[in-house]
């Protein structure tokens, strides 16, 4: 009987040892910080990571938009505009306290710049009342080259902007109504930014800068919107 008790006790002790060994095999120890760093690369950079371990979003490069547009501009001024520069300086106020579609804003600027060259006085005699009226309407389809990133979806719906403007010796009001949408036409289109519509390249570049656009000439002589401030 004494031998039997010793045998059972010895066997139980051996079973516990086996269970302990099996337990260490069934459950791996948690990975160390170094293991995680080596096996998983987060999209956000970690302090101390090498540049070649970081993830970057690829640039979309130069994009081409086919746009359908219509722009109607009406401006009142207490004095006639002396030159194109003064006219465009007044027109830039159309976007004061801008509350329209953010993604469309750079392209609105390009279209309004294009329309500015078409300004005409409504009635020269109206100056007798201390106000000069200018108006211009443009519409059609055109190309826009840009490197501003992803283009927004654009539906051909109108937006209206009415603002007061004041530049040194002149002031008045401006009203802009503009439609802008994409088109899938297969017809050949002219670029909206074209020096042919201006006195020269310099006038177009300066006008774009006043409107908040930085434009650059490409190798094929087309003009690219590189920045919108």
UniProtKB/Swiss-Prot annotation:
Query: What keyword terms does UniProt attach to this protein?
Result: Apoptosis, Host cytoplasm, Host membrane, Host nucleus, Host-virus interaction, Membrane, Phosphoprotein, Viral budding, Viral budding via the host ESCRT complexes, Viral matrix protein, Viral release from host cell, Virion
Q: Where is this motif: PTAP/PSAP motif?
A: 42-45
Cell compartments where the protein resides: Virion; Host endomembrane system; Host nucleus membrane; Host nucleus
Top-level lineage group: Viruses
GO CC terms for this protein? host cell cytoplasm; host cell nuclear membrane; membrane; viral envelope
InterPro entries reported for this sequence: Vesiculo_matrix, VSV_matrix_sf
Q: Where is this motif: dynamin binding?
A: 2-4
What kind of modification does the protein receive after translation?
Answer: Phosphorylated by host.
> Pfam families, per this entry?
Vesiculo_matrix (PF06326)
Q: Where do we find the motif PPXY motif here?
A: 30-33
Q: Name one GO molecular function term.
A: structural constituent of virion
Disulfide cross-links: none
Instruction: Give the family from UniProt.
Output: Belongs to the vesiculoviruses matrix protein family.
Task: Kindly state the subunit structure of this protein.
Answer: Homomultimer. Interacts with viral nucleocapsid; this interaction contributes to the virion assembly. Interacts with the viral envelope glycoprotein; this interaction contributes to the virion assembly. Interacts with host RAE1-NUP98 complex. Interacts with host NEDD4 and TSG101. Interacts with host dynamin. Interacts with host NDUFAF4; the interaction inhibits viral propagation and is independent of interferon activation. Interacts with host GTF2H5; the interaction may inhibit host transcription. Interacts with host DRG1. Interaction with host CTDNEP1. Interaction with host ABCE1.
The free-text function statement in the UniProt record for this protein reads: Forms a double layer around the helical nucleocapsid, the inner matrix layer binding to the N helix and the outer matrix layer binding to the envelope glycoprotein. Plays a major role in assembly and budding of virion, by recruiting cellular partners of the ESCRT complexes that play a key role in releasing the budding particle from the host membrane. Condensates the ribonucleocapsid core during virus assembly.
Protein's UniProt name: Matrix protein
Source organism per UniProt: Chandipura virus (strain I653514) (CHPV)
Q: What is the lineage of its organism?
A: Viruses, Riboviria, Orthornavirae, Negarnaviricota, Haploviricotina
């Amino acid at each position: 009987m004494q031998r039997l008790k010793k045998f059972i006790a010895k066997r139980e002790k051996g079973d516990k040892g086996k269970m302990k060994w099996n337990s260490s095999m069934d459950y791996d120890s948690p990975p160390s910080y170094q293991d995680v760093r080596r096996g998983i690369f987060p999209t956000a950079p970690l302090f101390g990571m090498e540049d070649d371990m970081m993830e970057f979003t690829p640039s979309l490069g130069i994009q081409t938009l086919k746009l359908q547009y219509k722009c109607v501009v009406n401006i009142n001024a207490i004095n006639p505009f002396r030159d194109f520069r003064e006219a465009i300086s007044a027109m830039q106020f159309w976007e004061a306290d801008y509350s329209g579609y953010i993604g469309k804003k750079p392209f609105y600027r390009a279209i309004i710049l294009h329309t500015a060259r078409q300004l005409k006085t409504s009635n020269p005699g109206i100056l007798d009342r201390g106000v000069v009226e200018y108006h211009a309407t443009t519409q059609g389809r055109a190309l826009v080259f840009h490197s501003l990133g992803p283009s927004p979806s654009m539906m051909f719906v109108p937006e209206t902007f009415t603002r007061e403007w004041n530049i040194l010796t002149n002031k008045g009001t401006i009203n802009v109504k503009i439609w802008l949408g994409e088109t899938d036409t297969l017809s050949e289109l002219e670029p909206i930014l074209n020096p042919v519509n201006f006195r020269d390249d310099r006038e177009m570049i300066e006008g774009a800068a006043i409107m908040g656009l930085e434009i650059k000439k490409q190798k094929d002589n087309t003009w690219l919107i590189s920045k919108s401030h």
